[in-house]
Amino acid sequence: NEQSGKSQTVIVGPWGAQVST
């Protein structure tokens, strides 16, 4: 999900780790 001018939150794995880019 690419949102212009906003950060992307990526949910990785069953642990629900959140990576903000």
Curated annotation (Swiss-Prot):
Oxidoreductase found in the keyword field: no
UniProt keyword annotations, A-Z: IgA-binding protein, Lectin
GO MF annotation terms: carbohydrate binding; IgA binding
Superkingdom to which the source organism belongs: Eukaryota
Chain intervals with Polar residues compositional bias: 1-10
Disordered, as annotated region: 1-21
Record family assignment: Belongs to the jacalin lectin family.
Known function: D-galactose-specific lectin, binds the T-antigen structure Gal-beta1,3-GalNAc (Thomsen-Friedenreich-antigen-specific lectin). Potent and selective stimulant of distinct T- and B-cell functions. Shows a unique ability to specifically recognize IgA-1 from human serum.
Subunit structure comment from the entry: Tetramer of four alpha chains associated with two or four beta chains.
Protein name, UniProt field: Agglutinin beta-2 chain
Top-level taxonomy: Eukaryota, Viridiplantae, Streptophyta, Embryophyta, Tracheophyta
